[in-house]
Amino acid sequence: IPKEVRDKDAVSRFLESVDQFERILNDSVFIRLERLTTDEIVGTPQQAGLIEKYFSLSQQDTTTLKDIQMSASEMRIGDDILCVHTLSDVDDLPGSVQTDTRYEKYSTDRSDCRLSFAAPVGLMLSCDHIYNQFLFIDDSAEILQRFEKTARNMHSLSKYSRANQLNKQWIDAYLDEAHSFGLTAIRCHCNVMAWSDNREKLKVIKNDTGSALALMGCKPRYNTIDAPALYWAGIPGGEGDFPSEESFFTFIEQGVCFFTEETNYADSLSPFGIKMADRTNGKPLHLDISDEPMRRGITTNRNK
């Protein structure tokens, strides 16, 4: 158990930071952050919790306990075989990232349909999968000092290899960005865990996941060796066991671009509305396009 967990002051400061973060997001109106209760995390005798659903790869409230099998070539949970793709190296990333991109299928000459940068591996990926996003905020000053030392070593070894000189230039560029704009150095990792109980279907899922990552401009990396460790680190509360070698250094601004903000549509709570359909899967929805948008501050006028 980390010593910080036993420190009441450290726990209190952590909870205060979480509460402040929650208020900031909830004040934006468009994004709502809700803290899970203990029962929602670990479950009750009548209803499965988040951890139990994760271990069984199921969204059902009544889940089935499944055996977890690990081997050198694959990982199985019950009958399901895991297929893991990772973004853990800067060489696998595009030259630039952004918070949102234009989705051509639903855009016109006069209007844009904007989706998050990572939308292709979110709801747009039509298979059973989990998209995990990790941001590790360590001591930024210590990280930058470590890079300064590495840059000096690379400079000393530059006469032996041109690669060392190029690495020093990349490190200097990273340090210049950090010091010029006051950016916070962090570690980031993203992975897509897909699964199927059919090996033939799993091959299709593997290709679809690789294509989705390619749409983001990323190089798909199929990971079999670290799948068990990454699955364990994805347990709610298990991020402390994340394998550090699977992360890459970046800044907060670039790291959050790999978040996916889309979610499935939900019925409006209003007693009246119109029937529409989810564009992704055709699910019928009850939608209030009149009063509810005004209550939420999305629009200030309406025509009835």
Region locations from a protein language model:
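Glycine-rich phosphate-binding loop of nucleotide-binding enzymes
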Residues: L269-K304
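Extended, folded cores of ATP/NTP-driven motor/assembly subunits in large transport
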Residues: I1-T263
